[in-house]
From Swiss-Prot:
<dbReference type="InterPro" id="IPR044957">
    <property type="entry name" value="Ribosomal_bL32_bact"/>
</dbReference>
<dbReference type="GO" id="GO:0006412">
    <property type="term" value="P:translation"/>
</dbReference>
<dbReference type="GO" id="GO:0003735">
    <property type="term" value="F:structural constituent of ribosome"/>
</dbReference>
<dbReference type="InterPro" id="IPR002677">
    <property type="entry name" value="Ribosomal_bL32"/>
</dbReference>
<dbReference type="InterPro" id="IPR011332">
    <property type="entry name" value="Ribosomal_zn-bd"/>
</dbReference>
<keyword id="KW-0687">Ribonucleoprotein</keyword>
<comment type="similarity">
    <text>Belongs to the bacterial ribosomal protein bL32 family.</text>
</comment>
<dbReference type="Pfam" id="PF01783">
    <property type="entry name" value="Ribosomal_L32p"/>
</dbReference>
<keyword id="KW-0689">Ribosomal protein</keyword>
<protein>
    <recommendedName>
        <fullName>Large ribosomal subunit protein bL32</fullName>
    </recommendedName>
</protein>
<dbReference type="GO" id="GO:0015934">
    <property type="term" value="C:large ribosomal subunit"/>
</dbReference>
Amino acid sequence: MAVPKKKTSKSRRNMRRSHLALGKVNVIVDSQTGEYKLPHHVSLVDGTYNNRQVVTKRIETEEAVA
């Protein structure tokens, strides 16, 4: 079984982990609804993309829910 020959210092450990940081999520404000959304994605509120309706909302009835 492989065992380290010397103890890894805090500096070397932290330098190795320097690339593991999470990046910021890029969000924009939708021009039609004013809600936050991811760029180049369909708006979850009204189903539009690039000012075009691409997803229609499904109307739920009592029969479909039951």
